[in-house]
């Protein structure tokens, strides 16, 4: 009997972009990374594209792309982020799908996913269809083929959703065994009840849908999947492979498929080095012949279903109550907050359902003015989302609109479609999954609702927001300081809202600290500066200017004027307003310039207040990343002064601290603080320098050991890793350069001197590529006695030892 193994990874992150900026702002909890997408890419998505297989001496013997040997899906919104922010990993995912087709009889391992992880049984049919269409189009755009399968968010399923998948050519999806109701052999008249989860997962099942269409369902092995995700099965790759092999049964007389499904982040993010356990397990299975590694498409072609199934509708893999986790206080939660309720889930769902319906009716009515078919236009809008260019948008509008649109009509049409996009993003499942209404995932979906409301207000001038907030107020929090959804909206959504004037204000403040070109970009906005004047008087600086601000998303633009005054430290004040004409602007510049020159600060502030009125702002208005950057610039001098004081204190008392350390006497806390600050900051700067002074860094490390000073592990590991990666990139671009090769080897040796592990994976990856592509030629020339290749090979072998990569 043939035996097959398929491992499926569901790779997904909740969207984290600010809906007004179309970008993720800095997330402190992800430190030392900018945000959680960046962190999880470093811990999981990247490592799975270049996973290590080690020998018995823990040296790397192979680097493999796990994605090419498993079945996987990536959330479209995550792939969009990877394409922009981590293109090497993104390309590795696409390459893995192409490679998998050579492994699996032409069947690619990637499958599609409903677009933004919406719980499909809780959506209306229109939204279900758009989710499927956008998921398919996104997949085809990226992988250049049609998907055979589609992942349903949380495997939440109903017959209408399956029928839509079948209608759009999807051959299969993956469910949990608990979602099957009954099964039988095709042709039999007797159904067997399997509602207790007892369906045999080792075969595919056909399901006949109400309209007569059919598709295939695979039910993954629950116990092994749970062991991988939660029970430490990834602690050793051999155990993982053994557990998979144990699932086969000699009692079965059909080709058996042992298959599991977990969150892809299990391999590396949730379980450190889980990607290596996965690589080892796959290699072990293949090398021992335990089974054939396959994917669902290949297995289905070879072994079509001979049994059929009926499902339990409105069920999922992560809620024992069906799909109540996304609409009710069912008891499913993270388990981290005993005593908390999730009664907020139902009113949040009701509020967003109400808003969806209100926006849909307005969209349909207004859309008739522009679109041949409003809902078809929404389905096809994914073409614009996948590539926002003048050409793409022009072609889309030419196809979908009843007539050519003028500029203002084009803006309205795009706002309608953006309103609908955010009306779907607000149903992303993560908004209900966790424990608290004011949690970041729930705030994110309410922000999408806020953006949809803002667009509706701009289009229709109606009062939907107040009605929505009345409904949202029924959602009660677990926290006294944010008791309900209305307060959450006012605290987290209202401050995040952006208008074109807000972008102008951001630009104005930033211009005091950065030299912008005449044409620049702030997130998804273009700025064209038409005038700019910077005046200085002592520590004070005054910037006056005007600029056109234009949204890249809806093409709306505004001509604004601004004035901003920096009085030193964090004291920044200014204003922005719609441009009032050349005469008014010239009068402002003349009046405020004269007053500023004579140092009359109170009068400058009065003029700013009089001219800009409600458009006044401060540093608080800056977008988060720029706010941090500017505050760091402002604080630099103070930090340098503080560091100099700490350094002076440390250097004066360092001999005493060493003497106390020799006697095993703990130093006074004040001295220890000075030493920790001085040594850690000096080390960080040394590692971030253009050229690392090796002797200095070794001396600093020796000092920390002698004085017992604790190192800032996260910051210094990140800096040491960055320095090594930078050198590796330079050497990879010039592999013949022996000096660069030696510098990288020195850096790798330095990394080993730190009292904590430094991630050298990027350097190892590049070394391994050159081991395959460049080393053979140098090795052959060195064997013939050529001196330069001999030197290169010697340095290369030394680097291999330090990177723990087996050569030869």
Q: What residue spans do the PLM features occupy?
A:
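Extended, Lys/Arg-enriched charged tracts that mediate electrostatic binding to polyanionic substrates
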Residues: 64-65, 82-86, 178-180, 184-199, ...
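Mature N-terminal, pre-catalytic/accessory segment of carbohydrate-active enzymes
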Residues: 1-6, 646, 650
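Extended alpha-helical scaffold segments
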Residues: 650-808
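Extended, well-ordered protein cores
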Residues: 627-631, 641-652, 658
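Short, well-structured secondary-structure segments
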Residues: 4-9, 13-126, 130-131, 144-152, ...
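Catalytic domains of cell-wall/extracellular-matrix polysaccharide-remodeling enzymes
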Residues: 141-189, 264-284
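Active-site and substrate-binding clefts of carbohydrate-active enzymes
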Residues: 2-55, 62, 76-77, 191-513, ...
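Acidic, His- and aromatic-enriched active-site or binding-groove loops in soluble protein domains
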Residues: 91-104, 108-109, 133, 145, ...
